[in-house]
């Protein structure tokens, strides 16, 4: 007879989203996380909603019969990343856990533009299992580090980070910010957050430094050589395609 103290008790729950609606799912997860801290509960799901409310430290990503823990020490996420993601990783963004490929973008423009362009190229992203995650100008590298491992056992999900170079053409300040900036001597010398081309002395180094902030393992950063993705495309002969895409979005 085994001592009762040596026995382990597990609760196994398979895909609760198949049986209860969204509000009940949230209530179930909250109850388990609050009352089941001293119990072993294993829950399987294909629901981004559930994945978004479970503490990141408690998530396991299953791929090709391997389990990849998201807990601290297993990923390249640091303590501040976990706090940030617990707050901002919502049900829409949590779709990244179920994708075959992920594209992380920094705004609604790219989030709308890329799927439309893919369709025009007959490469529907949904058909390929690719999810686009819009991080709203902040946190791109935090989301990328979800897929980067400390132990070197890589998750086989390609992740592309699309970020702007954010360096304007010299003519842009007068057009986009203030018409009084028509000459360089009129540009504010302090507290301005924007840069222009003439201020970047080593373009390759500037781009490389941005890339290295997120690159690694299965994560690769893509940066336009010019101002933004949209500006780059228009400047390289894709102006008509851009207009067609914008018209399609409308």
Language model: regions and residue ranges:
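Switch/communication elements of ASCE P-loop NTPase nucleotide-binding domains
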Residues: 1-94, 111-112
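Acidic, divalent-metal-binding catalytic cores of TOPRIM
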Residues: 60-250
């Amino acid at each position: 007879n085994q001592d009762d103290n040596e026995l382990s008790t597990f609760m196994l729950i398979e895909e609760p989203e198949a049986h209860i609606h969204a509000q009940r799912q949230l209530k179930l997860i909250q109850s388990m996380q609050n009352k089941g801290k001293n119990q072993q509960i294993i829950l399987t799901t294909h629901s981004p909603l559930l994945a978004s409310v479970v503490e990141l430290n408690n998530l396991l990503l299953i791929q090709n019969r391997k389990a990849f823990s998201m807990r601290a020490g297993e990923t390249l996420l640091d303590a501040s990343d976990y706090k940030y993601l617990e707050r901002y990783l919502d049900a829409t963004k949590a779709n990244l856990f179920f994708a075959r490929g992920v594209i992380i973008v920094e705004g609604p423009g790219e989030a709308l533009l890329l799927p439309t362009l893919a369709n025009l190229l007959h490469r529907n992203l949904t058909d390929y299992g690719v999810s686009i995650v819009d991080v709203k100008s902040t946190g791109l590298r935090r989301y990328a580090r979800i897929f980067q491992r400390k132990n070197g056992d890589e998750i086989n999900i390609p992740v592309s980070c699309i970020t702007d170079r954010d360096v304007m053409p010299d003519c842009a300040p007068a057009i986009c910010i203030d018409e009084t900036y028509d000459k360089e001597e009129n540009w504010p010398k302090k507290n301005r957050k924007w840069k222009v081309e003439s201020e970047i002395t080593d373009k390759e180094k500037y781009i490389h430094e941005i890339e290295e902030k997120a690159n690694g393992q299965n994560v690769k950063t893509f940066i336009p050589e010019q101002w933004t993705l949209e500006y780059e495309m228009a400047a390289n002969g894709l102006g008509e395609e851009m207009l067609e895409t914008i018209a399609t979005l409308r």
